């Protein structure tokens, strides 16, 4: 999203582009980590380097959650794609949308299908590829 020029991006589940040492918290870029052989280790303390992503049983970033909810509340249009909307808390974010243009794109049905103004049951990759091809 950032590479496409989006200014307000809330990475609720984190990003592999940021990495840090689990022991001393030194930051590492994705390029630095990818250049390492084997398990990535910190050059400062020898600790294991972990991507800044949320793993099972880890807490989500509250600022990212609150920012996401507020952005959804203020959105003129909400496009949700490639998710069954079954995993919470992110699945519940759709309920904060108060606008009148909800677009759902997913291969299978979701519990929010009945609220969608535009519903597409297909692969998000296929739908977006077709949209780009038609726009060009």
What are the functions of these language-model segments?
Residues 1-136:
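Conserved catalytic alpha/beta core of Sir2/sirtuin-type deacylases, generalized to analogous enzyme cores
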């Amino acid at each position: 999203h950032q590479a496409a020029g989006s200014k307000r991006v809330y990475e609720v589940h984190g990003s592999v582009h940021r990495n840090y040492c689990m022991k001393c918290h030194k930051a590492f870029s994705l390029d630095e980590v990818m250049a390492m052989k084997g398990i990535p280790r910190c050059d400062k303390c020898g600790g294991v380097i972990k991507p800044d992503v949320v793993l099972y049983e880890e807490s989500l970033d509250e600022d990212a959650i609150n920012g996401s909810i507020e952005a959804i509340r203020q959105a003129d249009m909400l496009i949700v794609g490639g998710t069954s909307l079954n995993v919470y808390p992110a699945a519940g974010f759709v309920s904060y949308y108060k606008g009148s243009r909800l677009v759902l794109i997913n291969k299978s049905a979701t519990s929010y299908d009945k609220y969608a103004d535009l519903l597409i049951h297909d692969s998000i990759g296929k739908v977006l590829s077709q949209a780009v091809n038609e726009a060009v």
